[in-house]
Amino acid sequence: MTSSRAAAQHLRDLARLRRVRDRIDREYAQPLDVEALARDANMSAGHFSREFRLAYGESPYGYLMTRRIERAMALLRRGGLSVTEVCFAVGCSSLGTFSTRFTELVGMPPSSYWRRAAGATEGMPPCVAKQVTKPIRNREARVAEPQLT
């Protein structure tokens, strides 16, 4: 394969990966699995996972869980739902897995976040609150609880 053909194929693969990533962003609360996402990209599951990680720096499942945790943070800040209700609202089927991943990304359990965030972003524009409370990817959360005020 010539270099121009390889470059064109690489661009087509990136476009397919982008469409799948957009689908994850839209349908994060639906049951999604790597095999179905790979079929959407016309790739095998293994190849899709490798290419997705190369393009976006994390696995498809990791990206999906990050989207779910970001949405869960918004729901917990808004209030009105319990941690369990938020867990199921964002598409997680296991409260344990949800709590573990939430703690890895945010640095505190969802129940603690819910208690702290309830008043911390009050009066703050939502666009600012989202940036201040955005999770850190790839298990880089600080050990100490973040200051939300």
Where are these regions (language model features)?
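Alpha-helical bundle regulatory/interaction domains
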Residues: M1-H47, L54-A55, S59, R71-T149
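Short, basic-rich loop-to-helix N-cap that marks the start of a DNA-contacting helix
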Residues: G62-L64
